[in-house]
């Protein structure tokens, strides 16, 4: 089993269930290790108390950290032969594995906040940035209403990564500094997105007729930092289907979630 570097600096002891979310938040592989393809596969993981990035190649004995301009990464994806990651502020980087380093390629979208969960997903050849806004007592300051859930999802916004043709111009350094920029996406068309603790996935609804709805975002409760502390209003209940056309949310699971330490995930 591969070992990570020590990322846990605590002076007191914690119960296992209270720190379970601090080990590996998410892991993405460059290809299926079982595929008969030349070249070794690579896996990149978000791990540790500060959610930093590390990678391992096929045959490695230890993980290697990827130097990054920030920490607290929300998601990572393998897209067009490279690994991309987004931090809690919405800044996107591309990771180099052969000579471990990272480069910022796109700024944080206007209006984003570190309290908004970010996801990266490839959909129809495009790289999308999905922002998930939460409400509830935990995220809306000044609210002290025991009836209101601790947290719940209010909605999503979708942006597409596009090449910035004005990059390098001196008229507005802040605007043209990065090689890529964000374009708003108002419709997913035939696609449905599946977001959560697992790697994000985009599927065609017409290819799986009757199984799920097009132009929708299916999401699970992946708020690990607060998942364990209050079963009512959290802990597996913040799940649903967001319609990008109507901006409405409907439930997809109404049963009782039974695991106190393991957030739900998609099995696709």
Model regions and ranges:
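C-terminal closing repeat unit and adjoining cap/tail of repeat-based domains
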Residues: 42, 147-268
